[in-house]
Amino acid sequence: ELAMRPHNSGHWTQDGAVTSQFAQHMRAVLDLPLGSSEPTAPATVMVNVLGGRSDPGEDALARALALDPQVRIHMYGKSRRPGRKLGHVNLVVDPTADPAAAVAAALARARAVAAVLRGDA
């Protein structure tokens, strides 16, 4: 897919690249030199936060942050509706860990945080 805007598939760059897709987009629009697109770690995982069937409660963000302080949470301020994309979470993989195991563990951690924000945990 070609998108002439920042795209969901690049949201990981907010926390996992030297220059995020949003900064790159602004640089391109303003005819400025592009920044480095190098990753800051071997991998970054991103999990979408979709509206769940139940309200996660007013303390969901605090519970999500307490569950895993290394996860970066990006919520969009949208009203909740089942299936609606409300945000995403990113987790940069530890560069010293075994890549395959670290990615699987990071994905599980990011999914657990997304479940809290969705109202499923």
Summary of predicted features, one role per range:
Residues 78-121:
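Generic C-terminus detector
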Residues 6, 27, 73, 79, ...:
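Short glycine- and Lys/Arg-enriched binding-loop motifs that mark or flank ligand-binding interfaces
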Residues 9-11, 56, 82, 98:
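Intrinsically disordered, low-complexity acidic/polar segments
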Residues 3-52:
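Active-site "cap" helix and flanking loop/linker of ATP-utilizing ligase/carboxylase catalytic domains
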Residues 27-35, 69, 115-119:
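Generic secondary-structure signature for well-ordered alpha-helical cores
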Residues 40-41, 47-80:
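Glycine-rich active-site loop/lid that clamps phosphate-bearing ligands
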